Amino acid sequence: MKIILATSNKHKVLELKEILKDFEIYAFDEVLTPFEIEENGKTFKENALIKARAVFNALDEKQKKDFIALSDDSGICVDVLEGNPGIYSARFSGKGDDKSNRDKLVNEMIKKGFNQSRAHYVAAIAMVGLMGEFSTHGTMYGKVIDTEKGENGFGYDSLFIPKGFDKTLAQLSVDEKNNISHRFKALELAKIILKILTKG
């Protein structure tokens, strides 16, 4: 049994392949002609399931016997922004690029009179195959700051300091980040399900 990732985000593909290295993983565009998926769910879990279903349903009948579609939906929830950007994290600025999203988050926080805030990341993992639909989730707590620090990672990593650390995610090594991240926690649970589904 193989896994097709329901994402074309190169950063996510690399991170997912690293964490799921015990499995045979294919990026979306290695198996299918890429297509747009409308993420109109109201929660991370709903959006993850929408993406995994869309990719699984695009496979032909033979591929459906060989593949499980796996999707991640994740984002950052900032306390002083009443939980925003949340499920809109990837398109918070309306431009869809990481730098614009980070700039908007900092500007919104400063407008409210804060230069930092408690925040948490959420990741939902959805798996869809002939055996059914499954989902897991993970959370990472910490705070966001108003100044970018570090060169690693993507998204809001350069603004987020995990609880118990004095560095942003972008200042941590890949291994350090993967050991504490919301996505890692959700994927560790997903691995248990995948091991059962991929037997035989």
Swiss-Prot record:
Matching InterPro entries: dITP/XTP_pyrophosphatase (IPR020922), ITPase-like_fam (IPR029001), RdgB/HAM1 (IPR002637)
The protein's Enzyme Commission number: 3.6.1.66
A GO cellular component entry from the record: cytosol
NCBIfam families per UniProt: RdgB/HAM1 family non-canonical purine NTP pyrophosphatase (TIGR00042)
Natural source organism: Campylobacter jejuni subsp. doylei (strain ATCC BAA-1458 / RM4099 / 269.97)
Family according to the record: Belongs to the HAM1 NTPase family.
Keywords of this entry: Hydrolase, Magnesium, Metal-binding, Nucleotide metabolism, Nucleotide-binding
Protein name: dITP/XTP pyrophosphatase
Residues reported in the UniProt entry to bind substrate: T7, S8, N9, K10, H11, K12, S74, F154, G155, Y156, D157, K177, H182, R183
Enzyme class at the top of the EC tree: hydrolase
SUPFAM superfamilies for this protein: ITPase-like
Pfam families: Ham1p_like
Subunit structure: Homodimer.
Binding annotation for Mg(2+): E38, D73
Catalysed transformations (reactions): XTP + H2O = XMP + diphosphate + H(+); dITP + H2O = dIMP + diphosphate + H(+); ITP + H2O = IMP + diphosphate + H(+)
Job of this protein: Pyrophosphatase that catalyzes the hydrolysis of nucleoside triphosphates to their monophosphate derivatives, with a high preference for the non-canonical purine nucleotides XTP (xanthosine triphosphate), dITP (deoxyinosine triphosphate) and ITP. Seems to function as a house-cleaning enzyme that removes non-canonical purine nucleotides from the nucleotide pool, thus preventing their incorporation into DNA/RNA and avoiding chromosomal lesions.
Cofactor: binding details: Binds 1 Mg(2+) ion per subunit.
Biological process annotations from GO: nucleotide metabolic process; purine nucleoside triphosphate catabolic process
